[in-house]
Each structure stands twice: as structure tokens, then as C-alpha cells.
Amino acid sequence: MALKVEAKGGKVGIQWDDGSDYHDVTKIYVRGGLEGIQFIKFEYVKAGKKVIGPIHGASGRGFTETFEINNLEKEYLLSIEGYYNASTGVIQCLQFITNKKTYDPIGYNEGARFTLSASRSKIIGFHGFADKYLNSLGAYFIKIPSIQSAIEGAKTTGKGFDDGGDYDGIRKVYVTTDGSAIRHVRFDYDKAGQVETRERGAKTGTQHEFTVNHPYEYITSVEGTYAHTQPYNCVVLTSLTFKTSKGRASPAIGKVTGSKFKLERQGDAIVGFHGRVGSCIDGIGVYYAPLPPSPPPPEKLQGQGGDGGDSWDDGAFKNVKKIYVGQGDVGIAAVKFEYETYTSEVILAERHGKETLLGYEEFELDYPSEYITAVEGCHDKVIGSETGVITMLRFKTNKRNSPPFGLESAFSFILEKDGHKIVGFHGKASTLLHQIGVHVTAIA
């Protein structure tokens, strides 16, 4: 069954839906004008035959571009990036990304940015809203099957293992070696944002770790060696090296001796492992899936408040889990935040400001289904401070609003970006919180 991804843009005009019973998208017609994208039209492939879809929108003065996707050469549409005007609800720009090419954008890079994508999936259909212009665009996705490689090393000794290839990526690799053989492997896979762990072998020796910054980084290559090794009296893996889409490589883990091998497929990521295991890891193979486009990096929004104190920046994370706000006599005295990293570790960042005898009030999110979309607040000059101080904070999520922490004052502000969630904080602080800003990333 196809996955229907919500349309991005304005939900105004006539709702349309081309459906999801196609095999591929083969041609896209887009007409742009001064006010945005006027219309869009698709050609699909179904049971080997071309199906021409209707026009969505209207034709005015402008320019039309055609994007051809060569499905006969196994090219398929992975994702779409674009911008829409939050006031008018009109799509302003579209860019199409396939497994073989990133096409030039059509339109103007203005407004709220959006992405239509799904992990390890291709687009087979579209839906949205339109009237005189294309107001919103959504898509249907189906999973792209992974491809299993042959096993390198021993192919008959030990027992077979197979983690499968239905994961979105790999977050962390653990390899244990005793100096002559690879004894144990463990893989932390990502599946729909959750970690699933698989491990094989005997954990005897020294364990080495290699962390991948998923979803911004993927393992793309595994190199290694294997040899007939004593005292095991059989062929076993003697070393492993992992390389990523960012050009990083782990050190060679183990003893580089014997026959060399390399598991790599152009344009693909490694999303799973299989092989043979006995007292050691005797052989290893992988599952390949198309390397997805990297999500846009987090964006840092300018802080609001006064200019006093020292600058601080927690950075950007996968999500915010918990917020602590400490109040003082004249304003917010301190804040600290609990985050989840992309490797599923929970960290409590440093305190910003000075803790008072009043302690902290807490706001805990229903993670992972709940996330922060905006921060509202107030700032003002107060007695004892030459520059502005944050006097009130309130956090808005996709489900609810927090109570206000502190008191409203002269100057109010809001930190948010349409279509984005808050994944980190920065600001300025002394014995009080003078300024606060946020890091945001597009909501998947």
C-alpha cells in the first residue's frame, strides 16, 4: 500500500488527487509565473503504458518547463523540494530529485521551505489543491526494495544470519576483535526514527565503535579481509573498515591480513547486513538501498531579547524532550534543556543563567509524537540590569501550549518558522536570561 504524504502549501482551492495505482512518474510539466507556480501536470506509467494526468491549476502568462524521468533506465523520483507563500498559499518553487539527478528548480526560492520525501521510497502519484495557481502539493510513496549482496569470506561454515534490508539506515556499528579475528558485530539500525539492535558472535576481545550521523550520513562501503586463521581452523573475517557518504572512514578494525574485499554499490547506501557466524564472524554481506537526498541542515533563527551576558549555544539535535525554566525576582533566571541526539542518546545540556532558591518548573514533551513549533516570550529592562531580560516564556507544540513561565512585560516576541520544528536553543545569559533563540528543522 502506498504512503500518502500530506500536501504542503495552502489548503485552498479545489482539492485534486491523481491516485496511487501507478508504477512510476515519467514526465512532469510545470508552468511558472510572477505570482508562483500556475499549474502542474504529470505523466505516469501503469502496467507498462503511459497515463496522462489532468492539469492542476490554470495557464496564464509565464513559462513552462518539462522534466523527463527515464524510467526505462531505472530512474525514479525520490523527493521534491520547494517553497510556498504562507500568505497567499501559492507554491513558489519546485525542484525534483531522482536517484540519478537533481533537476534545476523552477520558480523563486521565496517563502516557507518544504520537502516531500519518505525514507527509502519513490514517488508514484500526487495530490493537492489548486485554483488559478498550484496551492499545495502532496505525494504517494512506495518502498524501494533493497538488494542483497553476495557474502564475502566463508560461505558455508558457521550458521547463517540475516538482519534483513528493511531499515532506513545505520546509526552505530560495534566490532569486537581478539587480534586475529572479528569475534562479534553489533549494528544499531534506524527504522522509522527508532533504534533496532542486532548482534552476532561472541563478545570476546576489544570492542570498537563507529558512529554515523544519521539521517545526514549513511554507510556506503564496507571493506575488509578474511583468512584461514588459527586456532579457529577455518576462514574468518580478520578486519573491517566502514566508509560513509560524507567521506569519513573508520580505522581498520582488526588485523589487515589475507584476502581483501569491498562491498559497495554506486549511488546506494548500506541498510542491513547478513552473513555467517560461528565462534567468529566467518563471512559478511550487505543490503543496498538508494542513497536518499540529505535533509536540509537545521536553521538558526536570530535570538530575541537583550544583549547582555555571554553567548551560549546548545546546537541542533533530533528533538527536544524536556524544558526546565527557573524564575527569579525580576525575570527568567535560568533555563536548561534535555535533548535526544541522532544516535538516540538523551543529554541534559548545561544550565544557562543562575539557579535560584525557587528551583525549576518543568515542561515535558510526549516524545516522539510531540515537538515544539514555537516559543513565545517577553523581554524588558528591569531594575539591576542595564540590558533587556527575558521575563516570560511559553512553548507551543503540535499538540498543546505550555503554561506561561514568568510575567508578561513591555516587549513580546515569537520564535517560529512555518513547517518547521524547534530542535535546539541558543541565547545570552549572565545571572539572568537576557536573550533566547532557536534552531529549527523542517518537519518530515
Curated annotation (Swiss-Prot):
One of its GO terms (molecular function) is carbohydrate binding. Residues 2-143, 146-290, 298-442 form the Jacalin-type lectin domain. This is Jacalin-related lectin 11. SMART domains: Jacalin (SM00915). Belongs to the jacalin lectin family. Pfam families: Jacalin (PF01419). InterPro entries: Jacalin-like_lectin_dom, Jacalin-like_lectin_dom_plant, Jacalin-like_lectin_dom_sf. The modification N-acetylalanine is found at residue 2. Keywords: Acetylation, Lectin, Repeat.
